[in-house]
């Protein structure tokens, strides 16, 4: 199972293997997994209880997935009690508007917006219940997995970025890329397009995807990463240096982004008719700037899987220290997950 763990998580974390010992390191924490006899010994280290709960759930879900039909027993030293998820917050849609022709923004109300007001975790899992049904929210199971409602109560889950937060009004904005993937159902885009004031949903998080701890940032991504890039740009302080490279469909998708950093620049790349995930514009644009990076520049990129892999390979090839880079898969062409 160690081989499956390494193969799967390489797109989501830094993976290190030394014989029967594997370390997974990401923005939300670290997992140390060792094979001892016929068992796996797992130790998790995260900065917050919410991130620990999220990491435990992710590890548990994947271990059961890798086990398939084989029996698996998973026990934790601090066995979680079956109960409502501690990091779940219900939200209600307040309004919807088009930011650009292909980007739609939902403003939602939430009673505990303050816990999302952090630069350490910009992302959440959006839980979208079936329309017309009273939501049944998931619970924590004793083995660490999340117990999801099934059948007619099944919930669609997708990752999104909190675009902005209004603590006084207890409201948050979430941006949705509006697209159709060759006729495949896209639950997130569908929710963004059809949500009406009063509609209910929920958020799990905040979790992975914090702002890098650096004063010099090279940020790159396609439109799926634009909300995260925009949030980081707007969180910047005056002494920072930021250059952003953003791939979008065309000029109509460009957005005006405010930044307090005195040294700020942005480069828009247009696909001009090419399908998302096929233009391959980001990797060469990043490569063109590698020789001019400062000694403390952190390179952050997020996009379609194949390009994220190409960017990661190019950064490693350039000799950039792994602690100064992050290239993340945000989506996979041909998949709706």
Regions found by a protein language model. Name each.
Residues 1-337:
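Extended, composition-driven regions rather than compact fold-specific motifs
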């Amino acid at each position: 199972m160690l081989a499956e763990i390494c193969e799967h998580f390489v797109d989501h974390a830094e993976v290190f293997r030394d014989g029967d010992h594997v370390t997974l390191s990401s923005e939300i924490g670290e997992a140390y997994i060792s094979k001892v006899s016929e068992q796996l010994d797992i130790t998790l280290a995260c900065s917050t209880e919410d991130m620990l709960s999220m990491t435990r759930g992710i590890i548990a879900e994947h271990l059961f997935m890798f086990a398939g039909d084989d029996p698996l027993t998973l026990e934790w030293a601090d066995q979680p009690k079956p109960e409502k998820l501690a990091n779940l917050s219900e939200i209600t849609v307040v309004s919807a508007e088009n930011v650009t022709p292909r980007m739609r923004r939902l403003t939602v109300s939430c009673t505990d917006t303050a816990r999302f007001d952090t630069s350490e975790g910009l992302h959440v899992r959006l839980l979208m219940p079936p329309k017309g049904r009273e939501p049944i929210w998931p619970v924590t199971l004793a083995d660490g997995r999340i117990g999801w409602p099934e059948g007619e109560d099944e919930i669609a889950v997708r990752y999104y970025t909190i675009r902005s937060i209004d603590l006084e009004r207890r409201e948050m904005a979430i941006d949705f890329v509006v697209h159709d993937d060759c006729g495949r159902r896209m639950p997130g885009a569908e929710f963004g397009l059809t949500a009406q004031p009063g509609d209910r949903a929920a958020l799990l998080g905040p979790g992975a995807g914090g702002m890098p701890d650096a004063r010099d940032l090279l940020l790159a991504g396609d439109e799926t990463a634009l909300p995260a890039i925009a949030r980081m740009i707007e969180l910047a302080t005056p002494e920072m240096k930021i250059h952003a490279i953003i791939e979008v469909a065309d000029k109509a998708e460009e957005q005006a982004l405010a930044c307090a950093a005195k040294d700020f620049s942005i480069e828009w790349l247009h696909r001009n008719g090419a399908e998302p995930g096929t233009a391959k514009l980001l990797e060469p644009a990043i490569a063109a700037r590698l020789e001019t990076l400062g000694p403390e520049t952190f390179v952050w990129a997020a996009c379609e899987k194949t390009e994220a892999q190409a960017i990661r390979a190019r950064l490693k090839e350039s000799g950039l220290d792994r602690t100064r880079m992050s290239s993340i898969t945000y989506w996979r062409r041909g998949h709706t997950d």
